[in-house]
């Protein structure tokens, strides 16, 4: 029996989501379109298999084939990131980070991470996160120019003396200097942990410097710029750290790994290792630069005055409307983005004075410079006349026509 016959409600809602993804433009920087091959194996019989433990050391029988699958995923991950050890079991980036903390430090130890309101992540010590509840947290941020001042980070680190420094961000448009972070960590005897969830796809293509050999441990998601399945990974070059990480993930945080997702990670890594991937990642950055240049030419303020990676962060501190207003206006025109706090923020985190835009998903659909220029100008048109709902509807129809030339999925399920 087909899903349509068995559960038409879920079938119909899934197909409505397919329509939304195909007809609209996805510009949330953390979202992307994965491969049909990834989705195919995620929907396979591998979902049936319990495999607590690690390859060769399972608590259940019948794991000979999933052992081979996980081993293949590990080998591809190590080759991709040029590292010695990899754990591919984390179910998410947040759980990967939780595993890193559990492996390297103890409850009550101090961590230094990027302030959430400056572009950091919940799991980098935010008070509402378990990382801010289990551990004492302190923060560095960006200056008013939107860039990290590494001397300021050094001053904070020397004063606070954290056991672990987290580098990485969810809304930072510039290159992260991992070497400088390692210098600071070494000066105070701290571990350096790099969370590259947002930039991993660029890192493996040589479009952003690698955190290795500087970071003691590196984590990432596998979906954002890597275009794999939703999940997390942890990498290191230190065997002792690797053992602690493995124990922290299982049995510390998780039970049975999701073998259908681990297989999908392996498929995604195969794509990431291809020459085609390097072309894609380069285009992601090129498209982001087109987006940034058009918006600045149209007199919009960008945090840090541009971008080095896959995203731009618009600031509306000089405008009467908020990030939430911009988010809603673009949404009405079929462009999905997200409101975001900015340096010097004057509004609440639920309103914000910024907007985060990313190019990975549009690039996955085949958008290049020409299309990005069109989209960028439409964004500027909408924001220049933010209350004009007729304009928003007209642009929505134009973008729907544009999107129809770049259909990425012919069906909702594989």
Swiss-Prot record:
(6S)-5,6,7,8-tetrahydrofolate binds at residues 116, 120-122, 240, 348-350. It is found in: Cytoplasm. Its cofactor is pyridoxal 5'-phosphate. Signal peptide: none annotated. It holds the Pfam family SHMT. The record marks 223 as: Plays an important role in substrate specificity. It is an enzyme of class 2 (transferase). Keywords: Amino-acid biosynthesis, Cytoplasm, One-carbon metabolism, Pyridoxal phosphate, Transferase. Pathway: One-carbon metabolism; tetrahydrofolate interconversion; Amino-acid biosynthesis; glycine biosynthesis; glycine from L-serine: step 1/1. The modification N6-(pyridoxal phosphate)lysine is found at residue 224. It catalyses: (6R)-5,10-methylene-5,6,7,8-tetrahydrofolate + glycine + H2O = (6S)-5,6,7,8-tetrahydrofolate + L-serine. GO terms for molecular function: glycine hydroxymethyltransferase activity; pyridoxal phosphate binding. Homodimer. This is Serine hydroxymethyltransferase. It comes from Campylobacter jejuni subsp. jejuni serotype O:23/36 (strain 81-176).
